[in-house]
């Protein structure tokens, strides 16, 4: 049957199938389930596993009498609350005489007699094994103290109709440049979000949307010239998205109430209140076309009578301006990615449109953990629907984006039946198709001539000339034919020779082939390549200027086991310059001195599995998730699956000081079922080039990409491109071990079985694979977060209320039922058992990480840290896992993770000593991130630039009691 997280028992029962009558009868009814049935050779005995309280045992049934008794208890923990890919229990078997059962538990093999009162006999065994493992994959990524930084991403880049200019956004500000050799220039001096530019048909104007936390959004028009003239088109602030300018001079866009976006706590908001509207660019009244109804990618052709849109199943549709006469022109699909979780009959690939933008219709959980009721060990059967199908202005072909690649397809004439085109193999598509991208692409767009195509990736931008590509291919075919003709002539000449002459020619050819060292390799066939330009926009990095002395505090440096009971830490600008005993440092005049008497100093915490998903497509200027994590002492984060590339811009905004938050690192979208079914090493190299060259993520998430060969391609390509890959646990112990053997340096989520013995933990430790167990979403039992929700007064936490929007906090902490889980007796929780394995790993010199999984932003990190510590490791070990281990896991241990001279100034000042009680990690008085000193409660900056935190983006007042009604 299906499995699920936070499961109720029973999960399994045993059935008996009558092969003559074809009937199935359930023969067990145990609360703790019944599983792994094992029959004796003589048919007299049945042994099966079951759970009693929180432990698993073996039950012996006499099949003649029906009587049962416990044969062995406790034994190996069962895997009934997981996918159990190796079986719910290890296999067992009766001896040929049916008198003994051979089973394994407790790390040993046992011989169990069916006679009651007989003690189990250990069967001694020893295995001497030399285990071949891939070399350790580790890179160090320096953080440069430069004054400026190159923007990582350009977004929504669109060419002018004639292709001579390019409009795009960087850090949510609108730029225009002459294409391809111009210098990017700001269009306005606005200090709010500018997004989604669209050109007028004559190329002289640009329309774009805005967002401001106080004012809301509007639509603007910029007339480009010597001095750009900018005017606001809309008269009512609202939530606007995805404008498009038609050839009959109408600006069409999506509109929703301002509240819809202002109140959104995550990327997922309802499309129910959004409309498709149009306005005259000269002003006037907004005209309603239709409700959005899960449609998007608004665009136009030269046929001004119709509006073109997409639906989530990959269809290109059109309708008239009054929303009548809707037609479907084509339905497009791509490859079948490995391990997709689409359900039977579901054709949208878990995508939907919100305010005209294609969005993943899922939560962070579903895109980082194996979804309940699914098994991703086999490829799915449904191809990916196109995310965008954009009709060319000429109306005879379309630009397609599917699984992060871009194609051009021919649109067949309408004959009544909707044509379905697969671009999985363009050479065999039902209508002419062409793949344009080699390494992926985003934001596809046409030029007016319907011949040139544009797309972006990171800060790279490409143009592809379809006619030039066809001409290039035609020239290759002509050259091939000429070569074949020459070969044919040579063969005819050879046939005319006598036997001796042919033998001489053959001998010469063999000698030449032997001496030609290049004969063993087949040169790649030349092909047309898109033209690439790196769009360079530099922004000033946020870097403080000042000196801070943290004096007379307990300093837990994480430099080995060093603890300075009364120590000082000196910070100049954004670096620690000295750490020592009280009064031993040379302090510059004018330093800001913070008396830390009675307090404890630790490095800023590193969250190695932090899902912080802000708003996609349109970006806010302050992000509550970022503020919450920083206020709770998390100064560095790594999101190991972001689903989209929006994080690249958000990370730049933090680096620029536009958003207050921790350091934002990520793997970008996971490499795996997100988009791929890898064919070979070369394709894998191309896929990873997105991350190494264009996203600059430094780490990647190898997310169940497929079989072991495919996984080995990923780690080989990652090593070549200096990327550190982490892996998805997937509730599959065998998978986890092969990933370890292949040299992967990271593992996300707990290993699904426990206890773990030293053969496993020592191997992981020696391989230096960092295990981030994410115990708040434990495998194999109730999630640890449910322990805290039932033992803590979460909703009443004032600090949490300050940083968490009401809807988010109330939904998580007032009631917990269904998939969130509920109440579980303490003994049934498994997080401490998993934590024992982490302790064994750390005791043997291994690496672990603290990953909050985005379950409860801010405080959730401490819950995870306390859970990791619950397996018996010392408090100092737990703090090391939270700091220097985490920094090592993401290649930043030379810059972060300890309090040492030369490292970046990420420091927490705690009111209480976490060495005495690990829960004192949540006694934060001050947070210092990159040399800036913040109040640990309000996150107001104290030094060097005193200023209050802007909370307009998420703080709102509740209702005022004004009725006099008493309950």
Give the ranges of each region predicted by the language model.
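Active-site neighborhoods of metal-dependent hydrolases
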Residues: 674, 686-706, 750-871, 876, ...
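Metal-associated gating/positioning segment near the N- to mid-region
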Residues: 599-658, 676-682, 735-745
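A flexible loop/linker signature enriched in serine peptidases of the S9 family
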Residues: 1-15, 24-35, 44-67, 74-86, ...
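Divalent metal-dependent hydrolysis catalytic cores, especially in the metallo-beta-lactamase
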Residues: 625-645, 661-672, 694-705, 715, ...
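Residue-level detector of Asp-centered blade-edge/turn motifs that repeat once per structural unit
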Residues: 41-42, 96-97, 161-162, 201-202, ...
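Acidic, glycine-enriched loop/beta-strand segments at the rims
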Residues: 537-539, 555-568, 581-583, 859, ...
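Histidine-rich, glycine-flanked metal-binding segment
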Residues: 561-602
